[in-house]
UniProtKB/Swiss-Prot annotation:
Residues 724-733, 1318-1330 have a biased composition (Basic and acidic residues). This is Collagen alpha-3(V) chain. It comes from the Eukaryota. Residues 1-29 form the signal peptide. Residues 1514-1744 form the Fibrillar collagen NC1 domain. It comes from Homo sapiens (Human). Detected in fibroblasts (at protein level). Detected in urine (at protein level).
Length: 1745
């Protein structure tokens, strides 16, 4: 389960894959030369060669090979071990010189899964890599740039290192380990996180003898004064090839104008292909020497997989001259090229002092070895981890000091040794994986298959044949030039050079003592902007600046503490009807009402469920004999027929026993290429082939149907530059690029403009105190800054010093209404004053509390189209496409030689239109079109909202009292105000006295339901009243006139805030007051409660289009829209910035069928095929003649109860019924529950004054109350000067209530008084008795729609109403906000080919890839030979009845049938005419003597012609055809909405030729109305696939900071359990899903887990699965790494195991029984930290039977 590839702890070392080579010839103790097996020593791998460990060793000196990052060599391990196993105990023998570096890997052995089994890492610590190995102790650094001889002995559990002929202490290992040879052996490593060994290597041997490591310096790696060891044995009996000598004394000719090399004389020579002196071909000749080694029966030498950088010149290298040096007599040769390259400037023969170019006469490429080559490409930047320190660039030179005194002359020094190499630079970060390459070329192996009785070829011939085909196809396998890779890593540090000539004069002596201070130097250049200094001390307060702009509104303060309860106020007047309260508890069911009038007839209801089986009906009377029936069904099969003709050839029989091997036959001719075989196992990386030549352009083919999107193709070649396209939309910002290497220092640039201030860096070390600078000139005053954004509320500051007295402030607003004062002395009764004039309109009240949620407003007109939304996320992987059909068999042709590259052909003519394609997926919704022309001016809009109130006006001068105006008429009722906020529950009123029983009032007309008031506190239980008799229905009374105004009551408590009044006009600006002192910072208030949503305002006119807003937060996933029509081809956009290569995506599901292949050439005439199936159904025949009416049928059985009909439309209201008779008096009911509080009653009579309470303590500051409504104008007062606050006066005695005074003249508005103290909470009043029922109130307003009642009984069917008229289009709405990114749309049409992108950089070597998808269809082959006639196919499905055939020839007369039954006696015919008298007969025979018998009546056969039927037979056949077609669709449904299938597997079994697509199924086989549409994957055998809901298809990456790790996603605030939909986006019925699971045997589903710095399955840092995710199936079972179920999970890609960056992990679930899938929930465990995120993509679930 999952990806078990365990790489162990990440080490900074490279694995040494020890290709344990078993040697065919030789003994078991002979070591295996790995370098020779890899082709390094033979020169096939193209690895540079140079001097080795002992260059002076006789006879020819040691030679070594330079390997590095670009020399990743590999070979299949099984080729190294033909006997089939790796030695259990062995030794590693190595001679190398490594470059100074960190840990690096020299050799690695991988198994068939790509996991490393064994490796050797070199560096400061040498170690064997792999599960059972550990680092080995060593006393010497093996990567210090010097030659070392290293040997490692692995003997059982003991591992011993021998470094430079000195054995180190052994290390106890983990025991022997089995090493598989089914993988790959690589010189270096294939892991991108590790570094490949860089340096020179001379020997790399593997000996099956563990003691060989202790004899390394004597037998295999001797000292320089000893001879070289004997040649080792290569694997598989590879013949020994004499190593080419690299030494000579001749001088190469100088043919080009290249620069002359600077190497030593003995290293200037160019190696030639001359044989050794003792060779048989050591003679003067102009022929190229060849070395032929006979290998009659040996298999071919394994060719190593080489990945090198080669330079192909395209020129044939030929030896033109060979001569003998007269001095030494040795053979000398030079290489020249036929092409004239003298004029090329860069033809340089200087490649370095020790490594040269190896030139091969038979190959057209030069392999350039490292040396003093050209400057390499720019490497990728190194990533500086936190905590690392690097030396910065050198600073500017300091001032020149005074010349010190000359020191004494030192003794002459010895020539110094070469210095140690400098430290290596940090390795660059690994590059991003390159684009996945195209599928490789398929080689057709022409094996002959045994057929009939012919003898098959032997195995050796097949191998020879395969080898010949491989050689012939190598020329044609050259692929096109691949894309240029990414820039490589920085090149390795070169090898230290040989000791140079005598050095120049030595360096200066030590620095002398510090001289005197020199004179001031010239002023320096303006330095770079320094870091911002630390904040200085707080300056003195400046002068008062100009008054700034009005700041932003501050943040709302926290609510204050709760105040004490106020005194109980008097009962106020009944308020307006409140808003609808919450729905109360459901009351008891009322008494059953009388049956209403029957409603109108409803529509036909839905079909009901089948009723119970009825009783058997009465046996009917036998009916009259029926008419002659139709033709009956075919009879039973007859007896066996006669012997038939000879049949066709049968199927091949079972395979017989294997015969004895025959004698080897002569080689046959090349056979016909066979059919393509099945996909083989994963191959190893092949050689990088040379670039092939481009073929000629073929003729244009016919346009095929539009195919489904294929995999991402290789970047195309550069096309002709098109016309200038329109400017495209701005692309998204790309990823930040890596920092490049430091370039060469440029010239001094001009001083740039000062840049923006950078971010504060870390505080640096304190510098030395500098000299005091000169005082600069005072700067000019800066401009006034713009208004800043209000900052967050700061911490309370310390109280500042008291400021000076400010200017008088502006007049403050009217203060809040003060607390109720104590009862004053009774005033004198004043005279009734004249009615005052109408007061000025009051100031607008403060904004009330948010009212209850209003009704939904009308839909606004469609807004201006918003900007184009961001593109949606990538959809989940699609289903894997089906395997294409096999192509036509081609003719047997021999591959020709590759032709010359043809010129670019002309563009072909447009081909004929192709056949109609398969219905493609619906395209994406097209982009919003351009803004249309300006329309006509719209209708006048609604009046705008009232403007903001103006500034407060100054207090006007007191006007004279005007004359009393006439009494105005009673104005009309005002408009209904906005509903006020919900009032609190009222205090219980005083206990009232029980009233007398009132007379029964008249019954008023039914009023509209009133608005439901708020739920008040429960009242006291009243005395039970007597039930009154029910009075007759009386008419509604008229509204009474307004009563006289009563005497003013006592001052009440602050009332409930009234409804919000209309906004008043803006007042005049008030005078500016003095600026007051700054108050102390108040305590933060509590957070206020959230108000309800207000009513929607009327739609305003659309405003002008504003600027594009910032992208909003991701919205909730919307409902899946209908697929729109495919959009038009967009115009070509500008070239985008080249993005980084993404990570390898998860393998997609099976794709849809590909397009049909090209039409093949006409084949040869085939043999006669079998008889075809019956033809298609013919056209309908002419209508037959009308038949005679049949006899009435017998009484049928009662039919089944029909299904329940659909609910009919509501009928028209019936006429009102007659008033009912008053019902009898009911029984006394049980005591009911306490009813809801009634509306507030009228104010009671004033009670006696209560006793004065004690003075309460000052309460805490209460919450700021809402501004009350404007009060009535008060009496005119005299403006008094505000006096000081007096001491509280003594409480006076209660005075008698004064007489009601008349309202005085309106006085000027008084000033706001100080706030009074909070009073103490009053005592709770006594509970009053229940009052008498008041008179019926006026009918209330129509209330809102009540809650949905229980479903009523099904009424009779009503008449369908007339469709209403189409409504008028609404007004244009305001422009909508930019919507969230839409769901993933269907694949659009392919865009135009883009311009050639920038040249990419060379990428790193990738891992061994997975098996690629099937390649594209190859070129059209030649016509093949006619194939062998195949066996007869299975019997086809019966086709529909064919057309009526023409009248056939009359058949032979049939056999006389049996005697029929005697017919009924016919009616006597009429008397015929008398016939003529016949002739006299001959005399009869003599009679018998016995008694006479009656003569028998003989029948005679008289042929009577049958009547001809005209047209009737065709009508009968048409009816039979229609019936048979319907029966066939019932038996084998086609998967339509009317005839849904059971599951997709059944559809595939009944219709095997159906293409993949969406079909209707009905798993529970009930009514077809609950069928649903699914995707059927017939390519996979008929899988039924359901899609997940759009909400779970892509859950974006999020930190989920408020969620708990390990919890199910359904418990998250935004989460819920997974759900699945059909192809139309509708949820799948649970019952149907259960039936689908019952009908399925297996199920599979993909789940992609997106992560950021988090693990999803394996945690590679700890090596365990403690952070693995858990999954919940629909059967309630849980699946994780520790909990297994019937379902299995595999993890083919686990990118989250490293817990670094953003990546993905792909889970593939499969279940042998479909109970676990689909998935219901997921629980992530690794999140919660600040840099961790996770999301997921839920794939479709597919069931198969």
């Amino acid at each position: 389960m999952g990806n078990r590839r365990d790489l162990g702890q990440p080490r900074a070392g490279l694995c040494l894959l020890l290709a344990a080579l078993q040697l065919l010839p030789g003994t078991q103790a002979d070591p295996v030369d790995v370098l020779k097996a890899l082709g390094v020593q033979g020169g096939q791998a193209g690895v540079p060669e140079g001097p080795g460990f002992c260059p002076q060793r006789t006879p020819e000196g040691d030679r070594a090979f330079r390997i590095g990052q670009a020399s990743t060599l590999g070979i299949p391990t099984w080729e190294l071990f033909p006997e089939g196993h790796f030695p259990e105990n062995f030794s590693l023998l190595i001679t190398l010189r490594g470059q100074p570096a960190n840990q690096s890997v020299l050799l690695s052995i991988y198994d068939e899964r790509g996991a490393r089994q064994l490796g050797l890492a070199l560096g400061p610590a040498l170690g064997l890599l792999g599960d059972p190995f550990r680092p080995l102790p060593q006393q010497v650094n093996l990567t210090d740039g010097r030659w070392h001889r290293v040997a490692v002995s692995i003997d059982g559990e003991m591992v011993t290192l021998v470094a430079d002929c000195e054995a180190q202490p052994p290390v106890l290992g983990h025991g022997p380990r089995f090493i598989s040879i089914a993988g790959l052996t690589v010189l270096g490593t294939q892991d991108l996180g590790e570094k490949t060994f860089e340096g020179d290597i001379q020997e790399l041997l593997i000996s099956p003898d563990p003691q060989a490591a202790f004899q390394a310096c004597e037998r295999y790696l001797p000292d320089c004064d000893n001879l070289a060891p004997a040649a080792t044995v290569a694997p598989q009996g590879e013949p020994e090839t004499p190593r080419p000598r690299r030494k000579g004394k001749g001088k190469g000719r100088k043919k080009g104008r290249g620069r002359k090399g600077k190497g030593r004389k003995k290293n200037k020579e160019i190696w030639t292909s001359s044989p050794p002196p003792d060779s048989a071909e050591n003679q003067t000749s102009t022929d190229i020497p060849k070395t032929e080694t006979p290998a009659p029966n040996l298999p071919p030498t394994p060719t190593p997989l080489v990945v090198t950088s080669t330079v192909t010149t395209g020129l044939n290298a030929t030896i033109l001259e060979r001569s003998l040096d007269p001095d030494s007599g040795t053979e000398l040769g030079t290489l020249e090229t036929k092409a004239a390259r003298e004029d090329e400037e860069g033809d340089d023969s200087t490649m370095g002092p020790d490594f040269r170019a190896a030139e091969y006469p038979s190959r057209t490429q030069f392999q350039i070895f490292p040396g003093a080559g050209e400057k390499g490409a720019k490497g990728e930047p190194a990533v500086i981890e936190k905590g690392q320190q690097f030396e910065g660039p050198p600073g500017a030179p300091g001032p020149q000091g005074v010349v010190g005194p000359s020191g004494p002359p030192g003794p002459p020094g010895f020539p110094g040794d070469p210095g140690p190499p400098g430290p290596a630079g940090l390795p660059g970060i690994p590059g991003i994986d390159g684009i996945r390459g195209p599928p490789g070329t398929v080689i057709m192996m022409p094996f002959q298959f045994a057929g009939g009785s012919f003898k098959g070829p032997p195995v050796s011939f097949q191998q020879a044949q395969a080898q010949a085909v491989l050689q012939q196809t190598q020329l044609s396998m050259k692929g096109p030039p691949g894309p240029v890779g990414l820039t490589g890593r920085p090149g390795p540090v070169g090898l230290p050079g040989h000791p140079g000539l005598k050095g120049e004069e030595g360096a200066e002596g030590p620095q002398g003592p510090r001289g005197l201070q020199g004179p001031h130097g010239p002023p320096g250049r303006v330095g770079k902007m320094g870091r911002p200094g630390a904040d200085g001390a707080r300056g003195l307060p400046g002068d008062t600046g100009p008054k700034g702009d009005r700041g932003f509104d501050g943040l709302p303060g926290l609510p204050g503490e709760k105040g004490q309860r106020g005194d109980f106020g008097h009962v106020g007047q009944p308020g307006p009807p409140g808003e609808d309260g919450e729905r109360g508890a459901e009351g008891p069911p009322g008494p059953t009402g009388q049956a209403g009038e029957p409603g109108p007839r409803g529509l036909l209801g839905p079909r009901g469920s089948p009723g119970p089986t009825g009783r058997p009906g009465v046996t009917g009377i036998d009916g009259a004999p029926g008419a002659k029936g139709n033709v009956g069904p075919p009879g039973e099969p007859g007896p066996p027929g006669q012997q038939g003709n000879h049949g066709s050839q049968g199927l091949p029989g079972p395979q017989g026993l294997i015969g004895t091997p025959g004698e080897k036959g002569p080689p046959g001719n090349p056979g016909i290429p066979g059919l393509p075989g099945s996909d083989g196992p994963l191959g190893h990386p092949g050689h990088e082939g040379p670039t092939g030549e481009k073929g000629a352009q073929g003729p244009p083919g016919s346009a095929g149907p539009p195919g489904y999107p294929g995999p991402r193709g290789v970047k195309g070649t550069s096309g002709n530059r098109g016309l200038q396209g329109e400017k495209g939309e701005k692309g998204e910002d790309g990823f930040p690029g890596f920092k490049g290497d430091v370039g060469l220092k440029g010239d001094q640039g001009k001083p740039g403009a000062p840049g923006p201030r950078g971010e504060d860096g870390p505080e640096g070390p304190k510098g030395q105190a500098g000299q005091a600078g000169e005082e600069g000139p005072p700067g000019s005053a800066g401009e006034k800054g713009k208004l800043g954004v209000p900052g967050l509320p700061g911490y309370p500051g310390r109280p500042g010093p008291k400021g000076s007295i400010g200017f008088p402030g502006p007049l403050g607003p009217i203060g809040e209404k003060g607390k109720s004062g104590k009862t004053g002395q009774p005033g004198l009764e004043g005279e009734r004053g004249p009615p005052g004039s109408r007061g000025e309109r009051g100031q607008p009240g403060a904004t009330g509390q948010p009212g209850p949620k209003g009704d939904v407003g009308q839909d606004g007109a469609p807004g201006i189209p918003g900007e184009k939304g961001l593109p949606g996320l990538q959809g989940p992987p699609g289903f894997p496409g089906p395997k294409g059909p096999p192509g036509h068999q081609g003719k047997d042709g021999r591959p020709g030689h590759p032709g010359q590259r043809g010129e670019l052909g002309f563009q072909g003519q447009t081909g004929p239109p192709g056949p109609a394609g398969v219905l493609g997926p619906q395209g994406k919704t097209g982009e919003v079109g351009p803004l249309g022309e300006r329309g006509p001016p719209g209708p006048p809009g609604p009046p705008g909202e009232q403007g903001l109130p103006g500034l407060e006006g100054r207090e006007g001068a007191k006007g004279e009292l005007g004359p009393p105006g006439p009494l105005g008429k009673e104005g009309p009722a005002g408009l209904r105000g906005f509903p006020g906020p919900k009032g609190g529950p009222g205090d219980p009123g005083p206990t009232g006295l029980k009233g007398d029983k009132g007379p029964p009032g008249p019954v008023g007309a039914n009023g509209s339901p009133g608005e439901r008031g708020p739920l008040g506190p429960a009242g006291g239980i009243g005395l039970p009243g007597q039930s009154g008799s029910e009075g007759p229905v009386g008419p509604a009374g008229k509204k009474g006139s307004r009563g006289e105004r009563g005497p003013p009551g006592p001052t009440g408590k602050d009332g409930i805030p009234g409804p919000l009044g209309p906004l008043g006009p803006p007042g005049a600006a008030g005078p500016s007051g003095e600026e007051g002192d700054k108050g102390d910072v108040g305590a933060p208030g509590h957070k206020g409660s959230k108000g309800d949503k207000g009513d929607a305002g009327p739609p305003g006119q659309p405003g002008i289009r504003g600027p594009a807003g910032h992208p909003g937060p991701p919205g909730a996933d919307g409902a899946q829209g209908r697929r729109g029509p495919p959009g038009l081809f967009g115009q070509k956009g500008d070239d985008g910035v080249r993005g980084f290569v993404g990570v390898i995506g998860p393998p997609g599901l099976q794709g849809l069928p590909g397009p049909p292949g090209e039409k093949g050439e006409v084949g040869d005439v085939g043999s006669m095929g079998p008889h075809g199936a019956p033809g298609p159904r013919g056209p309908q025949g002419p209508t037959g003649s009308e038949g005679t009416p049949g006899l009435p049928g017998g009484v049928g059985q009662p039919g089944a109860v029909g299904e329940k009909g659909e609910r009919g439309d509501a009928g028209d209201p019936g006429p009102p019924g007659a008033p009912g008779i008053p019902g009898p008096k009911g029984d006394i009911g049980e005591k009911g529950d306490s009813g809801p509080s009634g509306a507030a009653g009228p104010p009671g009579k004033k009670g006696p004054p209560g006793e004065d309470g004690a003075k309460g303590s000052v309460g805490p500051t209460g919450l700021p109350g809402d501004l009350g409504p404007p009060g009535d104008p008060g009496v005119s007062g005299i403006d008094g000067s505000p006096g000081e606050k007096g001491d509280p006066g003594d409480v006076g005695g209660p005075g008698p209530p004064g007489a009601s005074g008349e309202p005085g003249a309106p006085g000027p508005p008084g000033k706001r008084g100080p706030s009074g103290h909070m009073g103490r909470e009053g005592r709770e009043g006594e509970k009053g008795a229940k009052g008498e029922p008041g008179p019926d109130g006026p009918p209330g307003r129509t209330g809102p729609m009540g809650a949905r009642g229980p479903p009523g009984r099904v009424g009779p069917e009503g008449l369908r109403g007339i469709p209403g008229p189409v409504g008028e289009p609404g007004l244009l709405g305001a422009p909508g906000q930019m919507g969230p990114p839409g769901p993933l749309g269907p694949s659009g049409l392919p865009g135009l080919k883009g311009d050639t992108g920038p040249k990419g950089e060379k990428g790193h070597i990738g891992l061994i890839g997975l098996i690629g998808p099937p390649g594209e269809a190859g070129e059209k082959g030649d016509q093949g030979l006619p194939g062998v006639q195949g066996p007869p196919g299975p019997k086809g499905d019966p086709g529909p009845p064919g057309p009526i055939g023409s009248l056939g020839h009359p058949g032979p007369p049939g056999v006389a049938g049996p005697l029929g039954q005697k017919g009924s006696k016919g009616s006597p015919g009429s008397m015929g005419p008398r016939g003529d008298t016949g002739p006299a007969g001959p005399p009869g025979p003599p009679g018998a003597p016995a008694e006479l018998h009656g003569l028998r009546r003989r029948r005679r056969f008289v042929p009577v012609p049958l009547p001809v039927v005209e047209g009737g037979l065709e009508e009968v056949l048409a009816s039979l055809t229609s019936l048979s077609l319907e029966l066939e669709q019932l038996r084998r449904p086609p998967g339509t909405a009317e005839r849904p299938g059971l599951v997709c597997h059944e559809l595939h079994r009944n219709h095997p030729h159906l293409p993949d697509g969406e079909y209707w199924i009905d798993p529970n086989q009930g009514c077809a109305r609950d069928s649903f549409r699914v995707f059927c994957n017939f390519t996979a055998g008929g899988e039924t696939c359901l899609y997940p809901d759009k909400k779970f298809e892509i859950v974006k990456l999020a930190s989920w900071s408020k969620e708990k790790p390990g919890g199910w996603y359904s418990t998250f605030r935004r989460g819920k359990k997974f759900s699945y939909v059909d192809a139309d986006g509708s949820p799948v019925n649970v019952v149907q899903l259960n039936f689908l699971k019952l009908l399925s045997a297996t199920a599979r589903q993909n789940f992609t887990y997106s992560c950021q710095n988090a693990a999803a399955w394996l945690d590679e840092a700890t090596g365990d699965y403690s952070h693995s995710a858990r999954f919940l199936g629909t059967n309630g079972e849980e699946l994780s790494f520790n909990q297994t179920t019937a379902a299995t999970v595999s993890v083919p890609q686990d990118g989250c195991r490293l817990r670094k960056g953003q990546t993905k992990t792909l889970f593939e679930f499969s279940s042998s029984r479909a109970g676990f899938l689909p998935l219901w929930d997921v629980a992530a465990t690794d999140f919660g930290q600040t840099n961790q995120k996770f999301g997921f993509e839920l794939g479709p679930v597919c069931f198969s039977s």
